[in-house]
Each structure stands twice: as C-alpha cells, then as structure tokens.
Swiss-Prot record:
Biological processes annotated in GO: lipid metabolic process; proteolysis
SUPFAM superfamilies in alphabetical order: Ankyrin repeat (SSF48403), PLC-like phosphodiesterases (SSF51695)
Protein name (Swiss-Prot/TrEMBL): Ankyrin repeat protein nuc-2
Residues covered by the GP-PDE domain: 717-1048
Gene: nuc-2
Location of the region described as Disordered in the Swiss-Prot/TrEMBL record: 923-963
Functional description taken from the UniProt entry: Controls phosphorus acquisition.
Length: 1066
C-alpha cells in the first residue's frame, strides 16, 4: 500500500488523532514546489546572471531552511499531541490501579459478578486499546518523517535524513518507547491479576512491592462495604423480592443520625442498580427505584456509562423509558465516545432508536472513537430495519470529510445486499474510501455476495473503475483474492479482463501469482479474445536517461533519477558470480512454518481477551538469535529457521507479548522429543499456551521441517568445482537478475524414486503393473522391483547404452524411463559426457495419506542422503577414470521439501523446484500416460522398436506433479537458495509478466514443455502460436531448440531433453 494511503487509513481508524498526523502530502508538495520555483538564490551562485534559472539541487539547497522549518512545525504538532495523550493515559492508569488496590482489600474473594470487577476489567482493556492507538500514532508518524526526509535527500542530493532523525526526531518524548512499554506492562499485569483474583487466587504479578498509600476513589472504604455491595447485588439477581426488601429495610435502619450512612447507602444502591440492569428482574429494579435512593442521573466512574447506555446495551426498555422520563442525558458519551443511540443501533434495538432520537435528534450523526456513526454500527452488524429507520430520520448517508467512513462501502464490504440496495435507493453516492477503494472493489475483494456487483452497475457504478490504491479494477481484486463467484459475475457483466494496473499487469497475472486455478480458467477464454503479443523484453539494466536540460527549471518527480550523479562508486559492470550456495556441514536446520490450514496458527480460547500482538521464538542455545514476529502473521513472517548443533537437546520457547511491552501474556515450549518423534523429519505440532498461572488459554500450531547434514562423505570443494550463477543489480533499489550460469548444453532427464529399503531406482510413476495389479514402488524391496522389471531389462542390451552419442539423448531418455534399474546403474551406463537432470519423485503428505503407504524410506533426509551418496560416488569414480571430465548433474522435483533437503545438504549441484500450474487437462494426460500401452505393458514381449514408436506418438508423463502458486514456489526457492524454477510453458504463455517476476528474485527460469506432444510444436499445427509458445515453436524441419526468449534460461522438452542457454556474460 502506498504510504500516503496508509496514513489516510490510519487517520480513519484513530479519528481523535487525525488532526495531529504529519501532513505528509503537503510536505511532498512542498519539496516539489521548492525544487521548481526557488525563492532565494543560493549563496554559492552569487555571480549568476539575473533571470538565469536555477537547477533543482541548487534550488532545494537555497530553500533548505524553508523545508526544515515546516518539518519542525510538523514535529512539534505530533509531539504536543503525544505529550497530552500520555499525560491523560497516566492519570487514567493511576485511577485504575487505585481502584484495583481497593478492590483487593476485601477479605473475601473477588467475584466475577461484582460490579467493580466487571467495570474495572473493562477499564483496563480499554486502556490497553487506547495505549495501542497512541503507539500506532507514534509509529506511523515516525515512518512519515523518515520517508519524507529520504525524499528530500534523494531530490536535493543531500545526506540529512539519519542526522535529523537521530538528533532531532528521536530526542522528542513522542519517540521514546520506554514510557509506553512501562504503561503497557502495568496494564497487562493488572489484567492478569484481576483474572486470578476472580478465580480465588490471591496472587500478585508485581515485579516489585509497592508500599505507597492506597487512596481509593470509590466508595469501598472497607471490607464490610465491599461485602455489602456484593451481597446486595446477589440478592437483586436472585429475584427474591421479599429478601431484597428486607435487606434494604435493615440497611436503612442502620443509618447514622448525621446522615453520612444515607449517602453511602444511596451510592451503594445506585451502583447496584446500574450493575443489575443486565440480569435483574423488572420487579427487583422497581424495588430499588422505590427506595428513592437511586441517583438515576449517575454514571459509572470507569466506563462512564449511565443507565441509558446500560439499557441500550442489554435491551432493558423499562430502564430506558424510566431514565428518559426523568431527564437522563441521552447525549452523554462513555469512555468509547458512544452515546446510547450508538448501542441501540449496534444491538438492533429498533424501538429504542425511536425513543432516543425523539429525546435527542442531534445524536443521529455523532461519531464515536472508532469513527462510527449509529448508521455505520447498524450496517456492519447487518440490522436492516435499524438502517431503514435511521435513514427515515435523515441520518447522513455520505461522508463529509476524508476521515469519515463511507456507509455504502462498508455495506458492500460486509456483503449485505438488502442494505446496499436500501442505501442506493436513498441516494448514496459511489465514492472511494480512505484507501482509495470504491464499493465495487470492496465487493470483489471480500467475495461474499456477487449480486451486489450487478446492483451497483444498475445504479451507475463502473465495473472497470480503477482504484486509487494500486490502480486495480474490481476484476483484479477478485482474481487476486480467488473470489470465483465475483470474478464470474464481473465477466458476465462485461468487465474487461485485459485492463492493466499501474505496473502494467493484468488480472491473470495476480490469479497465477496467488495460485487461483479456477480464476485462471475463467480468465483464459477472455484472454484469448485479445491477440497475444510477443514476450516483452526483460530490462535487466539500461542506459542512463537523457540529461535534463539545465537551461530552464522544471518540476521534478520525487521518484525520478537525477541526472547529476552522486559522489558514489558506480555499480560493477561485470555481473557478480555466486559459487554454490550455503549448505549444512555439521549443523541441522529446523524450519518452523505457520500456515493457515483449517484454523489460525495462534488461537486464544477467549477471543479478544488477550491483546496479543507479538510472538517471540527463542531457544536456550546462546548462538541463536530470537525471532520476533508481529501478529497477525504476514507472508514474509510465516517461516522461522534455526541452525542448531544438536537436535537431542534442542528446545524452542514460544512467548506471546502485548503490542508494546515486555510482560508475557502466554508461553509454551517445544521439547526435544517433539522434534525427534516427527515422522519423515516433518510434521505438524500443536502446543497449548499457558498464562503466568499455568492455565491453558490458547494454542499455537505449526509445521516442522528438519533437515540434517549429509550423513555420508561429501564431495571435496577443492577437488570438485561447484556450479555458479551470475547476477546483476544495477542499483540498490532494483531486483537481482540471473544473467548467466555454469549450466549449458543438453541434459537427459531421468525419474528417480525409492524402494521400500531406501534404494533410489528409475521409474516415472508411483505404481508399477505386476500381474494386472498396480503396486506402489515404495512398497517393493529392490529385489522385488528388479523381479518385476526383469522382462524389460532383458529386451535391451544395456551395455550398448554407453555407446549412444549425444545426438541420441532423447532415445536414452525413453530407454531409461521404462527400464527399471537403480540410479547407480543408470549413471554408469550413461554415455560419457552426457549430462543428467535427476527428476526426483517424492510424495507429499497428502499423497502419502491417499496412497496409505508409509515406509522407513519415507524420511526425506534418508532418501536425499541415498541419492546424494550415489551421485557423489559416481562423481569420484568418474574423476578417477577421467580427471579432465565430470558429468554435470541437476536435481529437480515437484516436492518443495525434497528440494530444500537436497539443496541444504550439498553445494555442488543446483536444484530446481518444479511447478505444474497452467498445464491443460493435466489429470487426463496423466491418466492417458498411465494406461495400458504406455510402458507397463512392456513387461510383456513388446520389442524395443515398437516401444520407441509408441513413445513417439505419446508424451511420457511422470507422477508426482504438483500445482502451487507462483508466490509460494518463489518464496520457497529464494528462502532456501535454490537455483531456480521449472514452470509450465502454457502458464508463461498466458502470463508473460511472470518471467520478469520470477527473474527479479534472482532465480533461473526453465520452461517446461514436457506435457506437450511433439506435433503440437510443429510448423504444420493449425494455429500460429505467439509469446513463449511461438518463440519455442517451429520444430518440424528446423532446429528443435531455437533460441530461447529473453529471460528464459532453459527448455525442458517432451522428449526428456533439458537444454540450457549457452552462457553469455552481459
């Protein structure tokens, strides 16, 4: 989100601070104005001829004092607001702490039904919320100062940001986090103590004793007073009218002659009346009122609610009518800035809305501390009748300022068709909210009721409207969020799927990036209507823009590159070569990932009671840095990785803290046996969260992946060269692109999986036909597997395989794909100098569960070690035989866990993660490839020639293919230093912009055309193919490997040949 929109959204969320935010937009305009129209001539240019214009940098330097004068005033405004709010919060906290101490002074336990307990607990929770708002105000303004100073430095070519922040901004009280942290800790401690006292545990979580004199601001002057309050409330709630009258009579009889007891009694009865509005019977409330001791005008001194607030919250019509008849103020606001009408609208009290508006009509448009009017409260809680009544009473339907909520937008966001239609009938305008989103964007993003889109169009909404946030249309929002019904409704109403956003990306790009297959299917026919274009070139770098004219001043864009170079060294012209990657020598990697499966990763049993905002993951190991994760989890914070020395003694502590503070809310620990007991070195774990009193108050769930170092003897780095890749980064703000690598030439693809006893064997499918029954390969031992495949091996003289030339690499692939031998045998049978791409088939957890098979060899570490041992032994043997030549090896797999393990265990060979997203009719192709006649029938007497002829007519498809979002595979590849990705050519043809997106993360890209028959790429095929398909087409009668499109590093063909570009150092 753009920072300017972010500030506007935050102003909407905390309206009481809105006027004190940094005027970020005005400061940006000021920089632009000062750079274009200088006020003062620079002192260094006194001999400049009159009328001669100034260049941008000189103009800004001349007006430096003007800019920083304005910055200082903005800083004063922010700091003054903070100092005032901090003082108010300190006073509130002292009052709450005094009340808590007085509450604790009772000899009996504190009941949850106690009047003061409930209001005091609510008071502390409200204090925490207000404290969080203050800290958010400080954070967003601190970011604003940092960003605007960065823009100034960039435009003026100066270095003032860090100096000004450290010497001016950070010296102000507003940017000292210590005070807010201490206040947060005190409030969190008090909430924990209140909960303990209510359960009968007289404990204290104070870090130090406090011997200060307790000054109570409430009328609980002693134990007897507190007990009397509780006893009277219990009697009222019991509904025993006779006992209640008798108790009140006895209380009146004890009145002192001077009348002091009458005042105390009246306050006690008033407190009891307010507390019993919720559950007290009508008769009991009347008894209290008949005593004449109830001060009907009073309000609670913590939440500041009077009887009208309480009646509206709990739906007590009798109290509301009685209070209004006695002249109780209907305009009084409570601690949340709400009047009784807010609560009546919030809870759908239609009759109360009429009564309150008759008593005070001007409250209809009052806003509370959440910037909600009564109408907005009714909308977000879907109270249709209340919305209608408020509109009849002329409630404001459109915002009056940028900091107001837009009722129509909120109704669209919450998916109420009836309320949206009602608002539109009353003339609601189609407006953008503080984020720059129109109603149609919110409907498409939330995806609840696509019918609203049709309704909005009937009232004049443009369904191709571009928002002011990202430049997205509603169609892009629906595609990005995977909202299929909304996407379908938009397409049916004629929305244009080819509109590009501000990054020149279509809706299809975001659907593919997020992995929404159904959305991609809907967008594909619409995309075909527009002629495809050639793959756009990838701009890895480029020439400097033309020098700006110095003869005339011009307004300068803040984001433009200045023509005058800074006094810094230029970036290197030669791309940086990176040899190999980080790998495990003796350490073990433990990866913790928090994925949202069926439930939230971190869950409290009483939602809203514990204001958790920060998770800290730490270990007792001194060399491990704790991981701090801001909640809720974001895409870039869902994975935490630790490298440890010993898994046997490894523990992880999970601690949950409030937003700003160091007081632990909840804690748990993962013991070593949890990690040791994981099947296949991976699994899911769920741990209880305990509060300081060791009560389970929630749970935390996460996936664990353990990667151990290679158990065998690795290849020596000094004897065996690692692969390398060259990357270019032309400035610090651009992404890193792979411009070349040591991978070149042709690689034969072989499919490897494991047997029951953990031996890597060659077979492209999970099952093998044995006597008409498909048996999983992983359930067979090596001896059993060799018995089943013996007939196929007997048909071919395997010794002749080593005599094949490099031009026969496709024949080698076909032979090895259905011959059923071990990986060890295959590597020694391959012709000298023929490189190999080892495609590893390893089932995911879902595939294992579906196959109902689990063997000892399923452990990813054992299987990866078995493969690497074979490859390493072959490399050593080949080096001993021919020191000048070593076979190049590439690993690839659709399983991200296996790719991660293979990459962490060695630095010598690159690893590619495959993704099958975008392949057309993938399941049908797999079924066809596994049917009779595709390889299993070769166990009979079919000749090698007939098998080769049949293979020419069909495309061999392996099992284990997996579809993932581009976002997920890119994140996995970059976080684990993989070489790159292998993606389906059809996907890249539909969304060419994905090439740029993948390459910008420093990943190599291979186009996978293995799912397409050879005939589909011939010149004789019916339709001319464009984009990647066109660039890779023309196979009949021409070079089967034409020059790859720019940005593509390799091509995987259906004949099992992987070809990389010849390396050119750019």
């Amino acid at each position: 989100m753009k920072f300017g929109k972010q500030i506007q959204k935050r102003q909407l969320e905390v309206p009481e601070y809105a006027a004190s935010f940094v005027n970020y937009k005005a400061l940006k305009k000021l920089i632009k104005k000062l750079s274009a129209t200088p006020i003062l001539p620079p002192q260094t240019d006194l001999r400049r001829a009159p009328g001669e214009p100034l260049d941008t940098q000189s103009a800004l330097q001349a007006n430096k004092a003007t800019f920083f004068f304005q910055i200082d005033r903005e800083l004063d405004k922010v700091n003054a607001c903070y100092v005032q709010k901090e003082a108010e919060l300190k006073i509130r906290l002292k009052t709450l702490l005094d009340k808590k101490k007085a509450l604790r002074s009772r000899s009996g336990g504190t009941s949850r039904r106690s009047t003061k307990f409930t209001t005091l607990q609510e008071g502390f929770q409200q204090f925490v919320n207000d404290l969080n708002k203050l800290q958010q105000f400080v954070e967003i303004n601190g970011t604003a100062f940092s960003k605007i100073l960065k823009k100034w430095d960039k435009t003026a070519k100066s270095k003032t940001k860090e100096l000004y922040l450290s010497r001016v901004v950070e010296k102000r009280p507003a940017f000292n986090p210590t005070v807010i942290s201490e206040l947060s800790d005190q409030a969190t401690t008090s909430l924990q103590e209140l909960g303990a006292w209510a359960d009968g545990d007289n404990v204290s979580f104070e870090t130090r004793p406090d011997h200060d004199h307790v000054v109570s601001t409430q009328h609980l002057l002693g134990t007897d007073e507190g007990d009397a309050d509780t006893l009277l409330l219990d009697t009222v709630l019991s509904g025993n009218i006779d006992s209640l009258k008798d108790m009140l009579d006895r209380m009146k009889a004890t009145a002192a002659p001077d009348g002091s007891a009458d005042v105390s009694l009246a306050e006690r009865v008033t407190r009891t009346f307010l507390a019993s509005i919720n559950e007290g019977s009508l008769e009991a409330l009347k008894v209290l009122l008949d005593t004449g001791l109830v001060d009907i005008q009073s309000w609670d001194d913590i939440n500041e609610r009077n009887c009208l607030h309480q009646a509206a919250i709990y739906g007590n019509s009798f109290v509301l009518e009685y209070g209004l008849s006695k002249g109780v103020d209907a305009e009084r606001t409570d601690a949340y800035g709400r009047v009784p009408l807010h609560y009546a609208s919030m809870h759908g009290r239609l009759d109360m809305i009429d009564a309150l508006l008759n008593a005070s009509p001007k409250t209809i448009n009052l806003i509370d501390h959440d910037n909600f009017t009564p109408l907005v409260h009714s909308i977000v809680r879907n109270h249709l009748e209340c919305v209608g009544r408020l509109l009849e009473r002329s409630a404001r339907i459109d915002p009056v300022s940028d900091t107001d909520h837009v009722p129509l937008n909120l109704a669209c966001q919450h998916g109420s068709v009836a309320i949206v239609e009602l608002l539109l009938k009353h003339g609601a305008k189609i407006l953008a909210d503080a984020e720059g989103l129109y109603p149609q964007h919110l409907v498409a993003r939330s995806g609840q009721t696509p019918e609203i889109l049709v309704l909005l169009k009937q009232y004049g909404a443009d369904l191709d409207q571009i928002d002011k946030l990202y430049g997205w249309t509603p169609l892009v929002h629906a595609a990005s969020e995977g909202n299929v019904p909304c996407l379908q409704a938009l397409l049916e109403t004629g929305a244009d799927p080819n509109i590009l956003d501000e990054k020149d990306l279509p809706a299809m790009y975001y659907a593919a990036w997020e992995g929404h297959l159904e959305c991609m299917k809907l967008l594909t026919p619409a995309k075909k209507e527009k002629a495809a274009s050639e793959l756009p070139p990838i701009h890895i770098g480029g020439a400097l823009p033309p020098m700006a004219s110095s003869t005339a001043p011009m307004p300068m864009s803040l984001d433009a590159i200045d023509p005058i170079p800074a006094l810094e060294l230029p970036p290197p012209i030669i791309p940086l070569r990176r040899y190999g990657h980080n790998f495990l020598d003796t350490k073990t990697v433990v990866q913790i990932s928090f994925e949202e499966d069926s439930e939230q990763p971190l869950l409290f049993f009483q939602d809203g009671k514990y204001p958790a905002a920060r998770l800290t993951i730490s270990s007792k190991s001194s060399d491990l840095i704790p991981k701090n994760i801001i909640l809720p989890f974001q895409e870039d914070t869902r994975v935490a990785s630790f490298q440890i020395d010993n898994l046997e003694s490894f523990t992880l502590d999970f601690e949950v803290f409030p937003t700003y503070g160091a007081k632990v809310i909840a804690k748990t620990v993962a013991l070593p046996n949890i990690f040791r007991a994981l099947l296949s070195s991976s699994g899911k774990c769920c741990l209880p969260l305990f509060d300081p009193r060791l009560r389970a108050i929630g749970q935390i769930s996460f996936h664990v992946q353990i990667i151990k170092p290679f158990s065998g003897t690795p290849l020596e780095i000094t004897d065996f060269e690692t692969y390398w890749k060259a990357t270019s980064q032309f400035d610090t703000n651009t992404s890193t692109f792979v411009t070349g690598s040591s991978l070149s030439g042709d690689f034969v693809q072989i499919y490897v999986q494991h047997t029951k006893d953990g031996v890597p064997v060659l077979w492209p499918r999970w099952t093998i036909n044995c006597g008409g029954i498909d048996v999983p390969v992983s359930t067979l031992t090596l001896a059993q597997f060799q018995t089943v495949t013996a007939a196929a091996r007997n048909r071919i003289n395997l010794s002749e395989l080593s005599t094949y030339t490099l031009d026969q690499i496709a024949d080698v692939h076909r032979i090895l794909a259905n011959i059923g031998i071990t990986l060890h045998e295959a590597l020694f049978l391959l012709p000298k100098g023929m490189h190999v791409n080892i495609q590893v088939l390893y089932p995911t957890a879902d595939e294992k569960a579906e196959a109902k098979s689990s063997t000892a060899a399923d452990d990813v570490n054992e299987f990866a070690d078995a493969i690497l041992s074979v490859v390493f032994d072959h490399a050593r043997a080949q080096r001993a035989e021919r020191p000048d030549s070593v076979r190049s090896v590439v690993f690839s797999s659709y399983n991200p866990t296996l790719c991660t393990a293979l990459n962490w265990k060695q630095p010598n060979f690159p690893v590619f993660l495959c993704n099958d997203m975008g392949r057309e009719d993938r399941k049908q192709q797999q079924q066809g490839s596994c049917s009779k006649g595709d390889g299993d029938e070769d166990m009979g007497g079919t000749t090698a020639a007939s098998r080769r002829e049949a293979a020419d007519e069909r495309t061999l498809q392996s099992d284990g293919r997996r579809t993932s979002s581009i976002k997920d595979v890119v994140r996995t590849a970059t976080s684990n230093n993989l070489m790159g990705l292998i993606c389906c050519s059809r996907l890249l043809d539909m969304v060419p912009a994905l090439v740029d997106a993948i390459k910008s993360h420093g990943l190599a890209l291979v186009v996978d055309k293995s799912g397409e028959p050879e005939a589909a790429n011939s010149k004789d095929s019916g339709d001319k193919q464009l984009g990647i398909s066109g660039a890779l087409g023309g196979l009949a009668g021409s070079d089967p490997f034409p020059k790859l499109p720019k940005g593509v590093d390799g091509l995987l063909k259906s004949n099992g040949v992987l070809r990389f570009n010849e390396y050119i150092d750019v």
